[in-house]
Each structure stands twice: as structure tokens, then as C-alpha cells.
Amino acid sequence: MADFLPSRSVLSVCFPGCLLTSGEAEQQRKSKEIDKCLSREKTYVKRLVKILLLGAGESGKSTFLKQMRIIHGQDFDQRAREEFRPTIYSNVIKGMRVLVDAREKLHIPWGDNSNQQHGDKMMSFDTRAPMAAQGMVETRVFLQYLPAIRALWADSGIQNAYDRRREFQLGESVKYFLDNLDKLGEPDYIPSQQDILLARRPTKGIHEYDFEIKNVPFKMVDVGGQRSERKRWFECFDSVTSILFLVSSSEFDQVLMEDRLTNRLTESLNIFETIVNNRVFSNVSIILFLNKTDLLEEKVQIVSIKDYFLEFEGDPHCLRDVQKFLVECFRNKRRDQQQKPLYHHFTTAINTENIRLVFRDVKDTILHDNLKQLMLQ
């Protein structure tokens, strides 16, 4: 009977895997699982839409990223909102210190001389304390300074200094928070969605946010825009689908915080010229966001862009004329005018509905261009 039994070698040929040891079977299972994972990852990477947010410091990149979380993510729960409270308190104290210092340097008299003591109190704030150095202020500390801040903001001297803010560096959201001191001073204060959008903390390093729209994976990458942070940009250039280049359109009359000499719009134009003419991005759709339209609309009423850009033609107090000029300034930075079209949008990053509508159009543009690239591969 034994003569009719097939040998082990015949069995292994006829039924591979039947005689595998438990260790070999486990190894084979793991190998198949790894192959599946690699296949899924390859499919994911091929479908992934990687969007790079670029632009000079304070152009609105981080605010735009917050909006993506609000619109396409899980929004900010109570715990996440509370984490912004120390940053907001820091924004207020830093902003008031800037105004007190500016009032003195601009030789603006106090409306009420007794506010000098409040000004001295603000300037004595220890900015080198551990939390303050990180751009955060505890509730307990903020409440100690709140009466002084409230008195100073009501002083005509500080108000006059604020009116001349283009002559020094002041955060754009300072007025919003100073106008809401009562809310900020409540013991159970929890930042609102608008508070979070206006809270300012400089971006250090690289921040990514992943989300899906109709089963299409998106990865949005925000890199610091200050000069010291731009060397990190090159770390993010791999496999980029699209670049959203943000510009603070209202800053045509302001200078950089870094050197206090270079015009901010000129700086943005120079950065854009480097990006748009880089061969690495020859197949990447570049979309220009002329941001802070709300502030630009206010500014053109009182400041003439022609005083800063002599080549401007048109009505300097007409928003549409100024916006048309800004678009042309950026278009003219492209050396190859025959390359892919330059898309542009006028945005207000703190306005959720505006960003929702704009990004809907941007998403369609990106996906359309991405599909064309995939078909050419």
C-alpha cells in the first residue's frame, strides 16, 4: 500500500503550500499583507492631491489652513478652542505694548496723562518669561493687565497711534481683540471660531493637514513664510500637485518686519518670481490668492498705491483698478508667458464662506489639471 503513496516531493509540487511549516505559512501571509499595503499606498499616492501653501510671512497661509479644517475637517472642539486662549491673550498684550511704544516714538500726547502709569505697566511686562517667550500668556496674568489695557485702548493718544499703524508693525487682528475685551475678560472665556481664525502665531517648521473630498485624498502643507523659514520650503517640493501662493494684497504701503526696509508687496513679487519660473514646477498648477480683500478695500479709500508703485495707472482709490494692477504685477513675473495659465482669486481668509466658495473652484481646477497630467503619464 505504501508503494502507491506519492513522495513528499511530488506532494509539494502538486500542492504547494500544503506542507508549509507554520513559520513559512506565517511568513507568506505577512508577505501578501505587505504587498497589499504597498499596492494600496501606491494607489493612494497616485490619487493624492498635495497642495503647497507658499507666500511671505503674514499673508494668511495658516488662517487658510484653519479654514480647511473648519470646512473639510472636524472643526475645533472645545479643547482645541481652549488651546488658543493663551495665544489670543499674548496677541492682545503684545499689540498694546506696540501701541504704547509707538505713541511715545511718534510724540503723540496722552488723552489722559494718568494713563502714563498704565503704559509703564504694559512696558514692564516680562516678554522673556517662559510662556510669554513662546507667544502665550496665562489667564491669571492676562487678567492682571486687563484694567490697564482697557484704559489705554480708550485713550485718544493710543487711538491716534493706531490710526498711524502703517508707520510701524502691528498685527491686523489687534483691533478686533481690543474691541472685545469684555468677552476676553470673562472667567469662562472660550475662543470662538472667528477668534481662532484671527489668532496669530508665527508658523515654525512644516504643518500638514490631511482631508478627503468625495473620496479624493488631499494633503495641504503650510510652511513658515518669514525669511528664516523659507529654507524649509525645498523639503516640501516632492510630488506637489498644486501651489497656492498667498499675497497680502493690502500691504502695498508696508515694510517687512524682518528688515523694516523692503516693501511687503515687492517681497511677495520677488518670491513669486522665483517660484513661478522654477523648472521643478513646470507641470504644477500655480494659483494666486490675493488675500485680505477686506483690508485692501478699506486701505484704497485713504492710501494711494501710486505713492509706492509709480507705474500704477488708473484710479488709486478704485478697488477694481488696484486689483487689476496687482494681478498684472504678478503675471509679468512669468518669463514664459506661454506656460500654463495663472489662475487667481481675490480672497478674505478670515471669511469662511468666501474660502468655501473659492476653494470649491480651486479644487475643480486642481483636479482637472491633475487628471490631464495622469493621462499624459
From Swiss-Prot:
Keyword set includes S-adenosyl-L-methionine: no
Record flagged with keyword Phosphoprotein: yes
Start and end residues of each stretch annotated as G5 motif: 347-352
Binding residues for Mg(2+): 62, 203
Subcellular location: Cell membrane; Melanosome; Cytoplasm; Nucleus
Keywords from the UniProt entry: Cell membrane, Cytoplasm, GTP-binding, Lipoprotein, Magnesium, Membrane, Metal-binding, Nucleotide-binding, Nucleus, Palmitate, Phosphoprotein, Transducer
Stretches the record annotates as G2 motif: 195-203
A Pfam family: G-alpha
GO cellular component: brush border membrane; cytoplasm; cytosol; extracellular exosome; focal adhesion; heterotrimeric G-protein complex; melanosome; membrane
Domain spans labelled G-alpha: 47-377
Region annotation (G3 motif) ranges: 218-227
GO MF entries: D5 dopamine receptor binding; G protein activity; G-protein beta/gamma-subunit complex binding; GTP binding; GTPase activity; guanyl-nucleotide exchange factor activity; metal ion binding
Described function: Guanine nucleotide-binding proteins (G proteins) are involved as modulators or transducers in various transmembrane signaling systems. Activates effector molecule RhoA by binding and activating RhoGEFs (ARHGEF1/p115RhoGEF, ARHGEF11/PDZ-RhoGEF and ARHGEF12/LARG). GNA13-dependent Rho signaling subsequently regulates transcription factor AP-1 (activating protein-1). Promotes tumor cell invasion and metastasis by activating RhoA/ROCK signaling pathway. Inhibits CDH1-mediated cell adhesion in a process independent from Rho activation.
UniProt name for this protein: Guanine nucleotide-binding protein subunit alpha-13
Organism for this UniProt entry: Homo sapiens (Human)
Gene: GNA13
